[in-house]
């Protein structure tokens, strides 16, 4: 009996809430703007070039024609840690895969210190 009474009360309360909110199409906090806010000297957000809070590139930094490998390697080299030296020239890395693997091993082992004598990376 109590369960039926509780279900009935929930149903009645739900119908009251639905009827009361029928008159409003939008929630109270939603505000329509007829015209975009225009402040002198500022561009609207959809026109702004700094949407992602990144720096704007100068024309000197922009590289128009990149091949597939360069398109991948350029961002990696830009974000490369400054403390690590590149031992092998960039052109040699593209030509010879064996030298690339040996350079990678030498940089990893150089960072390990005494563990490089064991021959394990962990």
UniProtKB/Swiss-Prot annotation:
The keyword Coiled coil does not apply. It is found in: Secreted. Expressed in brain and ventral ganglia but not in the retrocerebral complex (at protein level). It comes from the Eukaryota. Neuropeptide stimulator of juvenile hormone synthesis. This is Allatotropin. Residues 1-23 form the signal peptide. Residues 24-40, 57-122 form a propeptide. It comes from Camponotus floridanus (Florida carpenter ant). Keywords: Amidation, Cleavage on pair of basic residues, Neuropeptide, Secreted, Signal. The keyword Signal applies. GO terms for cellular component: extracellular region. GO terms for biological process: neuropeptide signaling pathway. The modification Phenylalanine amide is found at residue 53.
């Amino acid at each position: 009996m109590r369960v039926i009474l509780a279900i009935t009360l929930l149903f009645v309360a739900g119908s009251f809430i639905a009827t009361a909110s029928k008159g409003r199409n939008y929630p109270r906090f939603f505000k329509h703007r007829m015209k975009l806010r225009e402040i002198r000297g500022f561009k609207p957000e959809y026109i702004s070039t700094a949407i992602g809070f990144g720096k704007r590139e100068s024309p000197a930094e922009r590289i128009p024609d990149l091949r597939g490998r360069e398109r991948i390697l350029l961002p990696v080299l830009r974000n490369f840690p400054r403390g690590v030296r590149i031992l092998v020239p960039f052109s040699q890395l593209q030509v010879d895969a064996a030298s690339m693997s040996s350079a990678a091993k030498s940089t990893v082992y150089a960072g390990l210190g005494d563990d490089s004598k064991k021959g394990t990376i962990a």
